[in-house]
Amino acid sequence: MKVKLLVLLCTFTATYADTICIGYHANNSTDTVDTVLEKNVTVTHSVNLLEDSHNGKLCLLKGIAPLQLGNCSVAGWILGNPECELLISKESWSYIVETPNPENGTCYPGYFADYEELREQLSSVSSFERFEIFPKESSWPNHTVTGVSASCSHNGESSFYRNLLWLTGKNGLYPNLSKSYANNKEKEVLVLWGVHHPPNIGDQRALYHTENAYVSVVSSHYSRRFTPEIAKRPKVRDQEGRINYYWTLLEPGDTIIFEANGNLIAPRFAFALSRGFGSGIITSNAPMDKCDAKCQTPQGAINSSLPFQNVHPVTIGECPKYVRSTKLRMVTGLRNIPSIQSRGLFGAIAGFIEGGWTGMVDGWYGYHHQNEQGSGYAADQKSTQNAINGITNKVNSVIEKMNTQFTAVGKEFNKLERRMENLNKKVDDGFLDIWTYNAELLVLLENERTLDFHDSNVKNLYEKVKSQLKNNAKEIGNGCFEFYHKCNDECMESVKNGTYDYPKYSEESKLNREKIDGVKLESMGVYQILAIYSTVASSLVLLVSLGAISFWMCSNGSLQCRICI
């Protein structure tokens, strides 16, 4: 019995053995990513796919300055409001900037027909040629061309639009007029004009010397006849009369004809348009700065090569796609706080590793060994490099596929098109929701795949070592093996590089394994004896206890004992 107890004590004595473990890199990163199954997973490395910053400035776009309308609206600029005179010389731009509530629009009150459509057309124009379609001095010899209004005053004096002429009677007459222009510019030409609606018949007679005036405008694609509406109206800018403004695009080779016997606000300058689909109109109060950018938003410029942004849905230039997400981060490294249990959609399990190694800094996966010569970490460069190449290619592919940069400007609707505008917003919101969902789902799936990919690589490295060692070592958990033989540094290196010589160490391993197995058998015998003794002893204690209780109860009358023969 003394021998058996001695053997039992020996089995609990710690013995030194050479070991090798498979593990992965860890660091002090606090980056977190989301996956399909988990949120806020801490990882060693990740890349951001969502741009959320801007410089708060208006910048040149690829070296070309924007057209800043300042206190002028698009209407004031294109009609030639006298207060917008500084804009007349501007003929090219990268984009157009309008403030939210510009003061100088149509100085003479009235209705601007299809104004939102005109803005839409101008949003795709990057330059134009302003030219005199009907020269002021020679086109209207029988009419007065100096009509002005106090509502369009400039420097304290009555004035009028720079691109229009207010024709009135001359020498008490207003002869019928007919004027045409043939477009020979090889570009679309924007032509603007107006029709005056006096507040009373007296003004009508004084200005045009007729009570039954008309204005006719005809081209291949446009035909309309206007009749002045003479009526008293509420004063706007101290005017009871109104001017309604109209426009059309004249195709190359087409001719536009103006006929009237009164009330015509004639075109003086027209615009030969050059389209540029990278242009647009934005509404912004951001200040102009000496900066250059590839992407401009109303809030500021974005200088980013990322595929997504959440700064603003309206963009001009080469811009990331707008999404409503607040976080789109793609993992490139490994879990920094790994889970022990099995996980993953794609079958990879590395749960046998409880923690990463901060001591291994030269690779993602590798080894830690311990023997009589010491201990140390070593990265598996081949598997690490293969993983880096694969993940880098995947990230680049995702960015390339999703990084379709473009301009996204708002659509224009007038007050009578509110239902259409609301419907358009709902459609745009629907597309935006789809884009956001697709972007988030893509990142979640790829993050799940990447983490499972790392798990799989660690598992493969473990299996590679296991297949080499076979029964020359035993698995002791936590990704480690304990050798049945002495394994010096040269031996450890052969395991790492896949050249481990199994037969060389098999005999030593067999002897040590048999010794250990013998100890296990002796231990089993001891355990069996102890188990029998324990069972018998506990049974005797139970019987003695029951007997004592029964005797006591019989002696005090609590229990009657009858013996029948």
UniProtKB/Swiss-Prot annotation:
One of its GO terms (cellular component) is host cell plasma membrane. It comes from Influenza A virus (strain A/USA:Texas/UR06-0195/2007 H1N1). HAMAP family: INFV_HEMA. It is found in: Virion membrane; Host apical cell membrane. The chain crosses the membrane at residues 529-549. This is Hemagglutinin. It comes from the Viruses. Residues 1-17 form the signal peptide. A lipid is attached at C554, C561, C564 (S-palmitoyl cysteine). Palmitoylated. Keywords: Clathrin- and caveolin-independent endocytosis of virus by host, Clathrin-mediated endocytosis of virus by host, Disulfide bond, Fusion of virus membrane with host endosomal membrane, Fusion of virus membrane with host membrane, Glycoprotein, Hemagglutinin, Host cell membrane, Host membrane, Host-virus interaction, Lipoprotein, Membrane, Palmitate, Signal, Transmembrane, Transmembrane helix, Viral attachment to host cell, Viral envelope protein, Viral penetration into host cytoplasm, Virion, Virus endocytosis by host, Virus entry into host cell. The gene is HA. Glycans are attached at N27, N28, N40, N71, N104, N142, N176, N303, N497. Its main location: virion.
